[in-house]
Amino acid sequence: MTNRYTTLFANLEKRNEGAFIPFVTIGDPNKALSFEILDTLVSSGADALELGIPFSDPLADGPTIQEANIRALESGITPKDCFDILTKIRAKYPHIPIGLLLYANLVYANGIENFYQKCLDAGVDSILIADVPAHESKEFRDIAKKVGIAQIFIAPPDASESTLKQISELGSGYTYLLSRVGVTGTETAANMPVEDVLAKLREYNAPKPVLGFGISKPEQVQQAIKAGAAGAISGSATVKIIQNNISNKQKMLNELTYFVKEMKAATLN
């Protein structure tokens, strides 16, 4: 089902826009509110969703997303609940690309093929396994291909040419380009320039590069698009809005709406 990404990027290109993709953890802060949050993100103008399934040991995540995982797990969320929420959001929004960003342990625990099939059945378009680099991804890649899900790879800013070439050849859907090395979070702002990496990815005809890590302000989205990225992903900044408004649902949803609208507006060239 990579067609949703292909269609999205083609439509955005026609309109001279970039993609704004928020990331949140499914089930944060609880099951009922999680669906409303996803619904708000899409209805406010998100071009695609990147979502986490709560896991007790999120290696690449900074404190903000780790806390989101803890909140979701403490509310009693299960992988089955996550798939229910995904199915519901897919039914409401048939065209939006939905990606999962998770860790290998979670996939192994469910059996790789079984997990990918469940994802497909719930309407998921892509899977990015944060702790599996492209050169170690064969068992996941093969099943992704068989099932019909796009396998996304991370392109680090300090990647060698051969790594970038491999990511370009093996990936599908989009390429997750890191704006810097380290763990996620807005504590450390994204540091451009990534023009050189973007030029290489273009040369190798990689899936569309989307910039992530430390993206929290509209001007960073603007910079990313200007540098040649097809879009920007914002995780910690989105999750922080949830964290800061746990006891005030309406304020949370209002702030998420404002944030998405502002970030999306920055993708318009």
Swiss-Prot record:
Signal peptide: none
CDD domains: Tryptophan_synthase_alpha
Top-level taxon of origin: Bacteria
CC terms in the record's Gene Ontology section: cytosol
Tagged with keyword Nucleotidyltransferase: no
SUPFAM superfamilies in the cross-refs: Ribulose-phoshate binding barrel
Active site (catalytic residues): E50 (proton acceptor), D61 (proton acceptor)
UniProt pathway: Amino-acid biosynthesis; L-tryptophan biosynthesis; L-tryptophan from chorismate: step 5/5
PROSITE patterns for this protein: TRP_SYNTHASE_ALPHA (PS00167)
Catalytic activity: (1S,2R)-1-C-(indol-3-yl)glycerol 3-phosphate + L-serine = D-glyceraldehyde 3-phosphate + L-tryptophan + H2O
Keywords attached to this entry: Amino-acid biosynthesis, Aromatic amino acid biosynthesis, Lyase, Tryptophan biosynthesis
GO molecular function, one term: tryptophan synthase activity
Gene3D superfamilies: Aldolase class I
InterPro entries found in the cross-reference section: Aldolase_TIM (IPR013785), RibuloseP-bd_barrel (IPR011060), Trp_synthase_alpha_AS (IPR018204), Trp_synthase_suA (IPR002028)
Keyword Phosphoprotein carried by entry: no
EC number: 4.2.1.20
HAMAP family for this protein: Trp_synth_alpha
Self-association state and partner proteins as the record states: Tetramer of two alpha and two beta chains.
Role summary: The alpha subunit is responsible for the aldol cleavage of indoleglycerol phosphate to indole and glyceraldehyde 3-phosphate.
NCBIfam families cross-referenced by the UniProt entry: trpA
Family named by the database record: Belongs to the TrpA family.
Name of the featured protein: Tryptophan synthase alpha chain
Organism the protein comes from: Francisella tularensis subsp. mediasiatica (strain FSC147)
Phylogenetic classification of the source organism: Bacteria, Pseudomonadati, Pseudomonadota, Gammaproteobacteria, Thiotrichales
